[in-house]
Amino acid sequence: MRTDIINYLKNEIYERASKPSNKFGIGCYYHIEAVAKNAEILAKKFEADEEIVIISAWLHDIASITDYSLYELHHIHGANIAENILKQFNYEEKKINKVKECILNHRGSINNAKLSIEEKCVADADAISHFDSIPSLMYLAYVNKHMNIDEGRNFVVEKLKRSYNKLSDSSKEFYKDKYDNAMSVL
């Protein structure tokens, strides 16, 4: 396990997320941290390459927090940024390509085929991470979007439903209790 790369990425992502130029705010760091945590869990459960999955999870949104103008195509720009970073660590080209594929195919809003188990782990971890940040979603609804109680609740419920529906079938089964528990509270 390349802990040198992972530790560097944790710090680098935190630094980038902390900058005033990051339009998503520091909350984006906690989203990425939750993605990395869930990605590691899924990698173990589905016997994926943990190193590839964890590194990909830390890098999956790097373009978005680096430059907001890259957001729409952040999966493409992020793969390129990841390659540049990983080359600085003399990371194997074959592994760099696997990380790039995970980043290119992590977006649930873009229906790219997720061919490898590593790609599925990262995409599913990205979707399920919203269940680990419900307070952030509520803050977004009530503070940033100025919604009333019912509008905010519906906003959060619909976001969580969309996220859950983006999961692979195996991850839906794995996270069903988490989904049911969140919905019962909301």
Residue ranges and their predicted role:
Residues 50-68, 74-78, 99-107:
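His-Asp-centered metal-binding catalytic motifs of divalent-metal-dependent phosphohydrolases/nucleases
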Residues 1-18:
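Short alpha-helical hairpin
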Residues 4-9, 48-56:
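Short coil-to-beta-strand
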Residues 29, 33, 54, 93-104, ...:
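Short, well-structured alpha-helical segments
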Residues 35, 73-88:
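An active-site-proximal "capping" alpha-helix that borders the catalytic cofactor pocket
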Residues 17-21, 43, 62-67, 86, ...:
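Short amphipathic alpha-helical interaction patches enriched in hydrophobic/aromatic residues
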Residues 2-4, 22-47, 59, 110-186:
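Divalent metal-dependent phosphate-bond-processing catalytic cores, especially two-metal-ion Mg2+/Mn2+ enzymes
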